[in-house]
A protein has these predicted regions:
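Zinc-dependent deaminase catalytic domain
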Residues: 1-152
Length: 152
């Protein structure tokens, strides 16, 4: 019975990671496309998000190619998913396709009450030293509060 339930759990995990991958394709970012699915305790989708400019802000190719401009205003997929959720996220799980959460998003995740984060990094994504340091901070604070961060 346990192996059957374990297989079913893996099916759900893979299902939601694949959904996050599909949602990541909505991002217009030319270098990194990140997608998020937030799911409640009953495997119901609560919210989704992808990285991009705030609504109403022109996302022309010129602006998307301007790294300083893009970094200054882009909302991360985790932020968008949390902002668009219309219910309490306490106890929910977050699935991320692209990169694990940065330190700022980790802080938002902590405040939202999400309990587990599952992520998958595409093989073609390279992580800079700056981001590695930031991701290490994120992992530290998530571990400190007992949020599971699991690489799929």
């Amino acid at each position: 019975m346990k192996s059957r339930n374990g297989k079913r759990v893996m099916q759900w995990l893979n299902h939601f990671i694949e959904m996050a991958k599909l949602i990541s394709t909505m991002s217009k970012d030319p270098s990194k496309k990140i997608g998020v699915v937030i799911v409640d305790q009953h495997n119901r989708i609560v919210s989704t998000g992808f990285n991009g400019f705030p609504r109403g802000v022109e996302d022309s190719s010129e602006r998307l190619e301007d790294k300083d401009f893009k970094r200054a205003i882009t909302l991360h997929a985790e932020e968008n998913a949390i902002l668009y959720a219309k219910q309490d996220l306490t106890g929910c799980d977050m699935y991320i396709y692209g990169l694990p959460p940065c330190s700022h998003c980790a802080a938002m995740i902590i405040q939202s009450g999400i309990k587990n984060i599952y992520y998958r990094i595409p093989d073609e994504y390279k992580i800079s030293d700056h981001w590695k340091e930031n991701l290490a901070i994120a992992e530290t604070i998530l571990n400190e509060v007992g949020i599971n961060l699991l690489d799929m």
